[in-house]
Amino acid sequence: MTIVFRLEPGCLGPDGKQYIEEFCLLVQRAFAQKTVGIVQWEIIPRYDKLLPETEYRLGERGFSRDKAQRYLNACGKDLDTLESQLNLALPRMIEQYLARD
């Protein structure tokens, strides 16, 4: 299963559009190491605000959050926990990224 998470460029400040692609790759790499197995993260910029912040996919097929939760529960994982880990880590990662210069 793939969890697609879109990050707003503004989370990196007024010049965020310049850095968001690189930052998304860093976040994706970090979470790929933490969630080995049935879950893959796709962290991408959210340039289009009409697209949802989070999507759930199995192959090319998208499905609802409820179905994603049931799928993960059947595999012994919890969607709330996975999303919480990302949401807790993001502010720290943003802070570290902005302090890199």
What spans do the regions from the language model cover?
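A cross-taxonomic marker for long C-terminal extensions/tails that follow the last structured domain
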Residues: L72-D101
